[in-house]
A protein has these predicted regions:
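Flexible beta-edge/linker motif
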Residues: 41-98, 105-130, 232
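Amphipathic hydrophobic-ligand
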Residues: 33, 56-68, 95-97, 105, ...
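N-terminal type II signal-anchor transmembrane helix
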Residues: 1-32, 317-331
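Short beta-strand micro-motifs enriched in acidic
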Residues: 43, 69-73, 93, 152, ...
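Transmembrane beta-strands of outer-membrane beta-barrel pores
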Residues: 87, 169, 201, 246-248
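Elongated, acidic membrane-bridging lipid-handling scaffolds
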Residues: 105-211, 286-288, 293, 298-318
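Extended terminal
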Residues: 1, 185, 220, 224, ...
Length: 346
């Protein structure tokens, strides 16, 4: 026991003396970003604790705990039994050229792969600034990020991994604006998967620029977004089945807008696709690869358009005819009012 205690004290002394400078220098050397941390300590049975880690413009966390595997080290592999990150805050930026502020890690020589057996994120935060959508940076904030990813312990060679995650969207008033949830399992050996991703009761305005081809973002005042993606993979072939639903959509009127305004027309046009309860739903699916997932946007737009057509086809014909007639009438009245305005100006 005395030997273990002495070794523990020696390791902590070494980390306090050299660990901080070593970790900072490695981060700055590999990520090309300014880094800082408060202290580094050694814990039992075997863990390295980093307090107040910060990487300029990208990441900061109250604490990072790393538990390496001794057996993996003896086998010549870098295996982390667990990585726990408490209260991380990530700032992700996309520029006008669709490039992100993620650092490029240059591989020098053939470095051994790092295998992660477990990851836990507690009370995280993501700030996404999208300068491709808005030159000033459209801001999406996600709070209360909690992630739990764990590889099964037996058999040791298995790559079967369970995962679950949750997060809360935040609106412009810093209030909760919906929830994101993910759960399931993935086996990296045969490349199989069974999982689900959900957006529940998200305020439609929060993500409005990303579906403005469906709902005009500038006119959207309020509404709810729900989305479910069922992900199933077998031998690397991944099928994603999606259900997208908008409800309680309300368009705000700009100053001076009255009856048969542009806002009303947007609402009526969208209403053609809605069911009896006023919900607009799209059911669609696409195929990709589990190890290299990609989405063909052109094909996806076509798939969504087909889903919209099916949505109309599933409604009673008399309902659709009545909706189209009413909307066409309002467009005609709106066009007449524009014509009258231009006549007055002449």
């Amino acid at each position: 026991m005395l030997i273990i205690a002495a070794l523990y004290l020696a390791l902590n002394a070494a980390l306090l003396t050299f660990g901080k400078a070593l970790i900072i220098s490695q981060i700055e050397k590999n990520l090309y970003a300014k880094a800082s941390l408060e202290k580094v300590t050694f814990g039992l049975p075997l863990s390295i604790n980093i307090d107040k880690l910060s990487i300029e413009g990208l990441f900061k966390a109250d604490s990072v705990l790393v538990s390496p595997s001794i057996m993996g080290f003896l086998a010549g592999r870098i295996i982390l039994n667990s990585l726990k990150i408490a209260r991380p805050e990530i700032t992700l930026t996309r520029d006008k050229d669709d490039k992100f502020n993620l650092p490029r890690i240059e591989s020098k020589g053939k470095a051994p792969p790092i295998l992660l057996a477990g990851l836990k994120i507690q009370d995280g935060k993501l700030i996404f600034l999208d300068k491709k959508i808005d030159p000033d940076g459209y801001r999406v904030v996600v709070n209360d990020i909690n992630v739990d990813i764990a590889k099964v312990a037996f058999p040791p060679t298995s790559l079967y991994t369970n995962f679950k995650a949750s997060a809360i969207f935040v609106n412009g008033a810093s209030s909760p604006a919906g929830k994101a949830i993910a759960s399931g399992w993935i086996d990296f050996g045969p490349k199989d998967m069974d999982g689900k991703f959900e957006l529940k009761d998200v305020e439609a305005v929060v993500l409005s620029p990303y579906y403005q081809n469906i709902i005009p973002a500038k006119k959207l005042h309020s509404g709810k977004l729900n989305f479910i993606a069922d992900l199933k993979a077998k031998n690397n072939d991944l099928l994603v089945k999606c259900h997208l639903e908008f409800s309680d959509i309300v368009y705000g009127k700009e100053e001076g807008e009255g009856k048969n305004s542009v806002s009303d027309l947007f609402s009526d046009a969208l209403g053609i696709f809605s069911d009896a309860s006023g919900r607009v739903t799209f059911d669609f699916s696409f195929n990709t690869k589990l190890d290299k997932p990609r989405v063909d946007l052109i094909n996806l737009k076509g798939t969504i358009a087909q889903a919209a057509a099916q949505n109309i086809a599933s409604q009673p014909p008399e309902n659709v005819i009545e909706k189209v007639k009413e909307t066409a009438k309002k467009f005609k009245e709106f066009g007449k009012s524009l014509k009258d305005i231009f006549k007055k100006e002449e």
